[in-house]
């Protein structure tokens, strides 16, 4: 007997035929390089492919929709992972320069390594199989297959502390401190410098867990030793400031690169809106590129649908996740938006602070 005689002895009835036709509706389109001329075309073609290529294509499509939405949602970019070591400094800087993001929430390591590069430091080819004890003897730090100069790291830690020494004692948000720190460097390729020049707030909610925090700890120690009052980075002021941005925005959209503290912090700013008497309804758009998995239960890999149960992402939001390492996925999504020109004509967010109070948030057309 043939397979069909055993497994499919009876033909499908009309109802099942109709349902089958509904399900087998859209064909997968092969990636066709005869019709692909650039990264933008490649990523667009992924939208008709499968597996993580389709997820990446959907993330890129959502990012483009964010940029062109008539409501002009405030786009908050969350940054975690070894992005500078991976060679993405220029990509992130250009996302700011070309007005693809309005607010940044980052780990301290990313911001410090931008600062380190601005002061002449670099990242170098290495090997994950290196003799790490020898590297330690040479004061070379390893980030998987990439090396940095520990002597320069220590020098730059110290510079952060000495800069803090120049500030008036008091409470500073990470946004305020980072903006001031960026004034001490002059590098057009710097994320920090480009953000300051374009009035893009940069928050670092876990600043203590980084080389920036090491430098600030040195400042704290030296000030206490000398009987002076040190500055304090006020993490609750960070909450207060970021939540004002969320509350005063028409809508918000989130782009999470990896996960970690920045992802949850961006989401918690939506929850904290109730303190200001407002229910924002959650982010209108959300996308994430990550290698973390949902089934471990951790925040970094939790699905964006799960965030809807918390009200952090709108119940009708357009969202997608691509489980692809960010050193590959972020430049592809950026390249899609850049080469398609999806950022052009988008009014830049203009914010004005008075201490910890957001006095103005408007949009201005690009010159």
Residue ranges and their predicted role:
Residues 2-66:
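N-terminal glycine-rich anion-binding loop in soluble enzyme alpha/beta folds
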Residues 2-3, 7-9, 17-24, 251, ...:
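C-terminal functional extensions of proteins
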Residues 60-74, 194-196, 244-251:
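Glycine-rich phosphate/diphosphate-binding loops that line cofactor/substrate pockets in enzymes
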Residues 75-84, 104, 203-207, 227-299:
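Glycine-rich anion-binding loop/nest that anchors nucleotide
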Residues 87-90, 115-121, 214-218, 266-269, ...:
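Short acidic, glycine/serine/threonine-rich loops at helix termini
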Residues 92-158:
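A generic, well-ordered mixed alpha/beta core segment in the N-terminal half of proteins
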Residues 134-213:
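Ligand-binding beta-strand-loop-alpha-helix segment within the catalytic cores
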